[in-house]
Amino acid sequence: MERPEEGKQSPPPQPWGRLLRLGAEEGEPHVLLRKREWTIGRRRGCDLSFPSNKLVSGDHCRIVVDEKSGQVTLEDTSTSGTVINKLKVVKKQTCPLQTGDVIYLVYRKNEPEHNVAYLYESLSEKQGMTQESFEANKENVFHGTKDTSGAGAGRGADPRVPPSSPATQVCFEEPQPSTSTSDLFPTASASSTEPSPAGRERSSSCGSGGGGISPKGSGPSVASDEVSSFASALPDRKTASFSSLEPQDQEDLEPVKKKMRGDGDLDLNGQLLVAQPRRNAQTVHEDVRAAAGKPDKMEETLTCIICQDLLHDCVSLQPCMHTFCAACYSGWMERSSLCPTCRCPVERICKNHILNNLVEAYLIQHPDKSRSEEDVQSMDARNKITQDMLQPKVRRSFSDEEGSSEDLLELSDVDSESSDISQPYVVCRQCPEYRRQAAQPPHCPAPEGEPGAPQALGDAPSTSVSLTTAVQDYVCPLQGSHALCTCCFQPMPDRRAEREQDPRVAPQQCAVCLQPFCHLYWGCTRTGCYGCLAPFCELNLGDKCLDGVLNNNSYESDILKNYLATRGLTWKNMLTESLVALQRGVFLLSDYRVTGDTVLCYCCGLRSFRELTYQYRQNIPASELPVAVTSRPDCYWGRNCRTQVKAHHAMKFNHICEQTRFKN
């Protein structure tokens, strides 16, 4: 086993550092750091393992000592980051460790009993600290409101205080500004630099403890960005505070030095922070990278934020498209109809086959990151999403602020005991239960996007001008069939079969693609909807429908727009003229069923509009076009040319023509 060196002497057979668990039970042994590289994480193969704590990443971080200089650094390899004192160190970043640093693997702002924190102590003679200072540091961490105004006043008068390093002096003169709302650790750094002779004797005789320690500690899962809200730096953490502003995938420390030179608020003393440890950190970084492969960005992308593990049988939520394990979201949707990540109202739950295939391919290359068989069986048993489905209805709803915003699994806007998710329950505006809910007093406006809330649909602005009597008086039968609007994803009564018998029922589907739309039935409520379903002659295609309308050829499309503008015509006038030509048989469409009265959705209508626009442009007399347009030679490939999207080629050749070469 490799040992760190001290000068030119051979290393003694003893640990070079130790970790003291903050808030640990009496009698729990300290973690002695004996190896050159010490790994911490949830994976059972780590030197310090937390197999039951889902808030700790599989490979959370590693502590490495440089054999030549004795410099100790911590490198973060987690998905959520590691907190040193009050500074968050993110993935692939290294930070030098000093005696008295508090390392948080899990931080709970309002529930400190769930924290997983260790106090680092160097056992070398140059960086040794007394046991009394550690006790004071631990007390200050858990009692952050203690006044420390006089803690630093007597530091200069105490002859027992060792001389401060240049880095420490600069840090105390220029503390890094805080970005949090409160000072969480006001005394941790000050108290950690006050040793006493009695404490030094105690620190030399530390308890024994080895690798492979698996401390207890598991808590409810939280979002991975929870610790980012208190990333204010302690005085002795200024070096890492600047490195934390760099990209996470930075491979060396040289750009950090350049950035510090470029900052206007740093002087020559500030550069001393990285002058000495930079070479050591580079050496350690290269050794660590050669020793073991780092978790790549693919693993971070394929990680579920609820269980903090690789996705298993993942599902995506619509419309926000955030992805979770099916078993994880099954437990969440019992309590809330909001997305765990963005709090957007969930309308539909779908299997994400692409991500599932990516996870399988990733596990083939990294079989060590596979879940255990017991974990897989447990998740399959908890999975209640076996097929694509609507978001289950939640009966009782409350405001998001009523739950704990710190705990992802405990945050809930509903009472889980009253939830009924045995069957997906769809309620539309014309269901009797929806009317009963609408008759009740108005709710708190927080869950306004939830299914069943009157504000979500009934009061939303509609794109429909008026509703017929057949639509207004209709009431859904018990367990009646519903169709989901392809535009706004809101349910409506499925009356397409009834329309064949009663023409008064508004159309609910496109005549070409047969997809359901609610615009003609009661008005689509999606923001930005121009009217997703209408007769072709009444379809609103928007003012930008002429952009690239001619085979995505912007140059030819601009020629047409200029032609219409000089004659005071709009796209609606052109559509009217084209439909008249279509009725006479002058223009033709690829779908012969489409006429001016055919009910089309926006996409199918835009496709037919582009076909008519090409024929309209083709029939413009050459005398009505500029000479620069008519003097261009025809392209061999004509309208089928794949290069016409390039401006230079489009300006040089005419593409409103048929292909003349290689037509077979």
From Swiss-Prot:
The keyword Cell division applies. Changing I306A: Abolishes autoubiquitination. Does not affect phosphorylation. A zinc finger (PBZ-type) spans 633-655. A zinc finger (RING-type) spans 304-343. Changing P166L: In a patient with non small cell lung carcinomas; homozygous. It is found in: Nucleus, PML body. CDD domains: FHA_CHFR, RING-HC_CHFR. The PBZ-type zinc finger (also named CYR) mediates non-covalent poly(ADP-ribose)-binding. Poly(ADP-ribose)-binding is dependent on the presence of zinc and is required for its function in antephase checkpoint. The FHA domain plays a key role in the anti-proliferative properties of the protein and is involved in initiating a cell cycle arrest at G2/M. The FHA domain may be required to interact with phosphorylated proteins. This is E3 ubiquitin-protein ligase CHFR.
